[in-house]
A protein has these predicted regions:
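Aromatic-patch recognition
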Residues: 59-192
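N-terminal ordered "arm"
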Residues: 46-65
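Exposed alpha-helical structural elements
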Residues: 17, 33, 109-111, 197, ...
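Sec-dependent signal peptide cleavage junction
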Residues: 18-52
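Long, compositionally biased interface segments
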Residues: 190-193, 199-236
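Bacterial Sec-dependent N-terminal signal peptides
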Residues: 1-25, 229
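Short hydrophobic/aromatic-rich motifs at helix boundaries and adjacent loops
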Residues: 36-39, 180-184, 198-201
């Protein structure tokens, strides 16, 4: 009888270990996938050699503490995460002091979201597929509407000096974020670059929004002012 109980316990422990390993594999891919993917996305730039370019291909060049959640349940706590905006990948390693070479790529899934310090990132599939989907930062989530931010990096290649009186200009990564209003049903409405056209996104309430933004002198091209306007819109 004791042997039977011991056998059952060992089987349960083995199964739990296997499930834990499987769960880990589900949200973290092989490290070589990360290395290969970055090489295809780096435009001939070595990301580690920061002297060769200006700006950063990342939202933040440093790994920061964060958590990973799956369907609202904590999956990984206080690990090191960095968002590669160029590759649209979440790079993950066990601790902040872990070697960057040990970083892995988080599996893209709409069921998994990331919190880096206080910033929340969600993965949104495109037409039901992962391939053309992407990560968005949740700036605000209200009762009726949410404000999402898509981090986009414009890459400007290095410009070699053409004469002795000119100098070589390093490659540049420029921030070109795009904001979206997101409805509860999951519809995305991109905010245009023009201030006046942004108001049209508010639809039937654009006149109220125009009055509000004028009253408080809000510049909808600035994230802080746009957030103020969206919060007001959500309250209407």
């Amino acid at each position: 009888m004791k042997k039977t109980i011991l056998t059952v316990v060992l089987c349960v422990l083995t199964l739990n270990t296997a499930l834990a390993q499987f769960d880990t594999a589900m949200f973290v891919s092989d490290v070589f996938l990360l290395d290969n993917y970055i090489k295809r996305q780096n435009n001939g730039i070595n990301f580690k050699d920061t002297k060769t370019y200006r700006g950063t291909p990342y939202n933040n060049p440093n790994f920061l503490p964060g958590n990973i959640y799956k369907e609202g349940t904590l999956l990984a706590d206080n690990i090191a995460i960095r968002y590669n905006a160029v590759a649209d990948e979440m790079e993950v390693k066990q601790t902040l002091s872990s070697n960057d070479e040990n970083a892995r790529v988080l599996t893209k899934s709409q069921d998994i979201y990331v919190k880096i310090i206080e910033d929340i990132y969600v993965f949104v599939p495109y037409q039901g597929g992962v391939e053309n989907g992407g990560y968005f930062q949740v700036i605000f989530e209200g009762g009726q509407i949410a404000l999402y931010k898509k981090h986009i990096k414009e890459f400007i290649p290095e410009k070699k000096a053409t004469s002795s009186i000119t100098k070589t200009l390093p490659a540049v990564f420029k921030d070109k974020p795009v904001f979206y209003l997101v409805t509860k049903s999951g519809k995305f409405y991109q905010m245009p670059k023009s201030r006046s056209k942004k108001l049209k996104v508010f639809g039937e309430k654009q006149n109220q929004m125009k009055t509000f933004t004028k009253q408080y002198n809000l510049d909808l091209n600035k994230q802080e002012d746009l957030l103020t306007a969206v919060k007001y819109y959500d309250s209407l």
